[in-house]
Design a protein with these regions (language model features):
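Cytochrome P450
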Residues: 1-396
Length: 396
C-alpha cells in the first residue's frame, strides 16, 4: 500500500542514495516531500520546512528508541535521549563547547596541528588530503578534547574504528560486535584518569567537573559520541570543503583574493554536501505530516542533503557559490534540541585547515587523474582527495 501511494520513493535504491542522491532527492522534494522508502524501510523527508519541523518536535519524532544503533554500543547519551534525560546529559557539555570557550582553548592548538601535518606533506608536492590532513587533524583534536593525550591518537583511532564498525553492523541488521565492546571498554578505562583531571585539562574534564548528577559511565558514553562525531563528520567537512573549492577555479580565486570569504565558503560547502546526510527519528504516535500517514513506531529519516538544496530557500541550489548570502541557513548541524554540540569546534577545524592549506601551498590543485566524488548513504565524503602543488624550495 505505501509503495503504491509513494511511487517515487518506491523506486529509489540504496545505490542511488549512496552514490548520487541529489537527482532522486530533488524529484522527491518536488513531488513526494515525505515519501515511503522501502529501501530504507522508513519515511524520507526531503523538504526543508518539514525537515525542521521533524527535528524540532522530539515529542512526536524521538531519538529515544531501542533501535538506535549508537545507543546499543555506547549506552544512553545525549544522542539517544530526549526530554529531561537529554537535557541532563547535554547540559554539562554546553559550557565547554560554547563558541568563546572553543576559540580560547583550541585556536592555537588546531593551527599548530594543521601546520605540523602540512609540514609533513609539503616537500612531496602531492598528497591525499583526506587521510593525510583531514582525518589526522580531526583525530588529534578529539584526542585533546577528550583528554586522551596519554593514550595517543593512534590508539584513540583504533577504539573509534571498532565502535564505528559495531554501529555499522547493527545498522545493517546485525548484532553489536565483540571488538566494539572491547573498544568502548578501552575508551572507558582511558577516560577514568582523564575525568579526574582539573577542568582546564580538557573539554570532557570540564564537563565532568560540572556533571550535574551524571555518573562517570554516563560521561564516558557521551565522550564516545563526541569521539564518533568529532572524527567522522569533521573529516568529511574538511575533505568536502577542499574538494568543492579546488574543483571550481573561479570560486577558489575569489577566496584567495578575499580570504574573509572562506568563512562563508565553509558554510556553502556544508550546505551543498553535508558530512552527515541523514538523521533518524522514530514516531511516538500516529501522525499525518504533509499528507503522509505516519504510524507510531515508524522510522522517519530526515534528509539533510535534501533539505539543504531546497529551491524554496536556496536559489540555484545545486551551484557552489562562496558569496551565497543565506548559505548559513543550511541544516548540516541539525536543528532543535539535538543541534550539534560540537559545531563550533568543527567549524574552527575546517576553517583553519583550509586556510592554512591555501596560505602555504599557493598553487594547490586537484590531481587531474583523480577527481573526488562524495559518496555514502549516511556520512558523505570523497574516498580520496588527491592534490598536488609545487614543492617549496629547500632552505639554503
Amino acid at each position: 500500500m505505501r509503495a503504491a501511494a509513494f511511487p517515487l520513493g518506491a523506486e529509489a535504491t540504496l545505490a542511488q542514495l549512496e552514490t548520487d542522491p541529489h537527482p532522486v532527492l530533488a524529484r522527491l522534494r518536488e513531488h513526494e516531500p515525505i515519501s515511503w522508502s522501502p529501501a530504507l524501510d522508513g519515511w524520507l523527508v526531503t523538504r526543508r520546512d518539514l525537515a525542521l519541523q521533524v527535528m524540532r518536535d522530539p515529542e512526536t519524532f524521538t531519538v529515544d528508541d531501542v533501535r538506535f544503533s549508537t545507543g546499543q554500543v555506547v549506552g544512553p547519551s545525549m544522542l539517544t535521549l530526549d526530554g529531561q534525560a537529554h537535557r541532563r546529559h547535554r547540559a554539562p557539555f554546553a559550557g565547554p563547547f560554547r563558541l568563546d570557550a572553543v576559540r580560547e582553548r583550541f585556536t592555537e592548538p588546531v593551527a599548530a596541528e594543521a601546520d605540523r601535518l602540512i609540514d609533513a606533506i609539503a616537500p612531496a608536492g602531492e598528497a591525499e588530503l583526506r587521510r593525510e590532513l583531514a582525518g589526522p587533524l580531526a583525530a588529534a583534536v578529539v584526542t585533546v578534547a577528550l583528554g586522551l593525550e596519554a593514550a595517543g591518537t593512534a590508539e584513540v583511532l583504533g577504539w573509534y574504528d571498532a565502535i564505528v564498525a559495531s554501529v555499522t553492523e547493527i545498522t545493517a541488521g546485525g548484532a553489536p560486535t565483540e571488538a566494539g565492546r572491547r573498544g568502548f571498554e578501552a575508551l572507558r578505562a582511558a577516560m577514568e584518569p582523564a575525568l579526574a583531571r582539573e577542568p582546564e585539562a580538557s573539554l570532557v574534564a570540564a564537563a565532568a567537573g560540572d556533571a550535574g548528577g551524571l555518573a562517570r559511565g554516563e560521561v564516558v558514553s557521551n565522550a564516545a559520541v563526541l569521539l564518533f562525531g568529532g572524527i567522522e563528520t569533521t573529516e568529511g567537512m574538511i575533505a568536502n570543503a577542499v574538494a568543492h573549492l579546488l574543483a571550481r577555479p573561479d570560486q577558489l580565486a575569489a577566496v584567495r583574493a578575499e580570504p574573509a570569504l572562506l568563512v562563508n565558503a565553509i558554510e556553502e560547502s556544508l550546505r551543498l554536501e553535508p558530512a552527515a546526510a541523514v538523521i533518524d527519528r522514530y514516531a511516538t504516535r500516529d501522525v499525518e505530516l504533509a499528507g503522509a500517514p505516519i504510524v507510531g513506531g515508524d522510522l522517519v529519516i530526515v534528509s539533510i542533503a535534501g533539505a539543504n538544496r531546497d529551491p524554496a530557500v536556496f536559489a540555484e541550489p545545486d551551484a557552489f557559490d562562496v558569496r551565497r548570502a543565506n548559505a548559513k541557513l543550511h541544516a548540516a548541524f541539525a536543528a532543535g534540541p539535538h543541534v550539534c554540540i560540537g559545531m563550533h569546534l568543527a567549524r574552527l577545524e575546517a576553517h583553519t585547515a583550509v586556510a592554512r592549506l591555501l596560505e602555504r601551498l599557493e598553487d594547490l590543485r586537484l590531481d587531474p587523474a583523480h577527481q573526488p566524488a562524495p559518496r555514502g548513504l549516511v556520512f558523505r565524503k570523497p574516498d580520496t582527495v588527491r592534490v598536488c602543488w609545487t614543492p617549496p624550495a629547500p632552505a639554503a
